[in-house]
């Protein structure tokens, strides 16, 4: 399978497992799990031709580790990023490292400077331990801006942090007082 085919399947999985399972009649449980065979059968019926081997390849090669297979390989879910109300994944609550990072685009900075980071249509704000990963996320939306998050201070103030299956840190919101701009976009 080539990269284009893997990317197409990955985008479909993200759409179904994070945002719109009902678009193909897929059912997710409260923790976001879907039966692998059911997902493949319904995707095939909607014109997406792939099998379990292709799905496994997408899961294994996805750089951001967006998907998780159950221990018995019978179920699949998105690691994080759900916007569907029926999914309320119970991620492990953990103490975060002192500093986490968030990548955004410069066009969102006015809003962030006013209200901090909010989850929007998702259940959580996504943070990472790696500044380069954060910058690559910011690049997807325009001129990237790197923000440092005072995770230690937030945690000590009682804010709950969770860690998804793929290592991404999740929090309900980040106040503007807990943010520091580390890298602004380079003017062209």
Swiss-Prot record:
Enzyme class name: transferase
InterPro entries named among the record's database cross-references: Ptrans_KptA/Tpt1, RNA_2'-PTrans_C, RNA_2'-PTrans_KptA, RNA_2'-PTrans_N
Keyword Cytoplasm: no
GO MF annotations, alphabetized: NAD+ poly-ADP-ribosyltransferase activity; tRNA 2'-phosphotransferase activity
Segments traversing the membrane: none
SUPFAM superfamilies given in the database record: ADP-ribosylation
Pfam families the record matches: PTS_2-RNA
Described function: Removes the 2'-phosphate from RNA via an intermediate in which the phosphate is ADP-ribosylated by NAD followed by a presumed transesterification to release the RNA and generate ADP-ribose 1''-2''-cyclic phosphate (APPR>P). May function as an ADP-ribosylase.
PANTHER family: PUTATIVE PHOSPHOTRANSFERASE, TRNA 2'-PHOSPHOTRANSFERASE 1
HAMAP family reported in the protein's UniProt record: KptA
Name by which UniProt lists this protein: Probable RNA 2'-phosphotransferase
Organismal lineage: Bacteria, Pseudomonadati, Pseudomonadota, Gammaproteobacteria, Pseudomonadales
